[in-house]
């Protein structure tokens, strides 16, 4: 008996853009495991699987201040453009910076004047008549460069990046860190270095590369080289230090940072509506 429902099939279809029968078969083959089903659909070549599977349904904004980055969600972009909503986000990110909250629960308990962040969100939600949600927060203690990107001039920032870095204290350090923040915002790096990629992710990408190559009819003896080439392509896309720089495509981000004498220690990227 299948351990998934019609609703599960619908959800997988919405996440991946694959056909209904393909989604049903993928869930059956994976015994109802969504991650395995997504992997199976990627092997079969479903369009936009990797990108659409990360998408969440939300509007809202991101805000940054003093080493803190938050995402505050609303149900509609109409509310996201609301001045009171944006003012609340500014208060919340200020509370995140001062309290150094490590997670959403800690930030909800932080104070905004005489009330808590959680209470302030609930009060504005009741006033506006729309569900509001503090989705996530990040805080870095070191030297930080922040970048916020708007999708349109009339909308609040929807993409936020924090880059923690070390340098020699020159003005050029900040310029290099800012360039990296722009890079992360645009090319959506997921990991800092190759060593930061989880082993299960590497294993999954290797399986996908191998099965896809087999499905394409590639010679058996050529598979190892093809798989390694495609895996290196994955690293080049997902790993910040291995990406070609947007400012000089002939050099990697690592090469430009080395030239600037700057070391990125960690980063985070929030995008409204993305996992």
Swiss-Prot record:
Subcellular location, principal: cytoplasm
Location(s) in or outside the cell: Cytoplasm
Region called Involved in Mg(2+) ion dislocation from EF-Tu, residue ranges: 76-79
S-S bridge residues: none
Keywords, comma-separated and alphabetical: Cytoplasm, Elongation factor, Protein biosynthesis
MF term (GO), any: translation elongation factor activity
GO cellular component: cytoplasm
Leader sequence residues: none
Pfam families recorded: EF_TS
Purpose: Associates with the EF-Tu.GDP complex and induces the exchange of GDP to GTP. It remains bound to the aminoacyl-tRNA.EF-Tu.GTP complex up to the GTP hydrolysis stage on the ribosome.
Protein family (similarity comment): Belongs to the EF-Ts family.
Name under which the protein is recorded: Elongation factor Ts
Protein species of origin: Mycolicibacterium paratuberculosis (strain ATCC BAA-968 / K-10) (Mycobacterium paratuberculosis)
Gene behind this protein: tsf
């Amino acid at each position: 008996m299948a351990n998934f429902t019609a609703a599960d099939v619908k959800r997988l279809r919405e996440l991946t853009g694959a056909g209904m029968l393909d989604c049903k078969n993928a869930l059956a083959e994976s015994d109802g495991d969504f991650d395995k089903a997504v992997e199976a659909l990627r092997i079969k070549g479903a369009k936009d699987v990797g990108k659409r599977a990360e998408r969440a349904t939300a509007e809202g904004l991101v805000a940054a201040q003093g080493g803190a980055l938050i995402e505050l969600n609303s149900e509609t972009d109409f509310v996201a453009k609301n001045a009171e909503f944006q003012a609340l986000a500014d208060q919340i990110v200020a509370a995140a910076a001062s309290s150094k909250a490590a997670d959403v629960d800690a930030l909800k308990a932080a104070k905004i004047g005489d009330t808590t962040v959680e209470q302030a969100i609930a009060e504005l939600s009741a006033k506006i008549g729309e569900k509001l949600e503090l989705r996530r927060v990040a805080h870095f203690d070191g030297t930080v460069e922040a970048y916020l990107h708007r999708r349109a001039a009339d909308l609040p920032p929807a993409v936020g990046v924090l880059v923690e870095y070390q340098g020699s204290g020159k003005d050029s350090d900040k310029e290099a860190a800012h360039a990296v923040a722009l890079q992360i915002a645009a090319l959506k790096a997921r990991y800092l270095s190759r060593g930061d990629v989880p082993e299960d992710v590497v294993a999954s990408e290797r399986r996908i590369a191998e099965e896809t190559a087999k499905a394409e009819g590639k010679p058996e003896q050529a598979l190892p080289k093809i798989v390694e080439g495609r895996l290196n392509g994955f690293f080049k896309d997902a790993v910040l230090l291995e990406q070609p720089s947007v400012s000089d495509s002939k050099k990697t981000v690592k090469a430009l940072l080395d030239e600037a004498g700057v070391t990125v220690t960690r980063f985070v990227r929030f995008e409204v509506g993305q996992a």
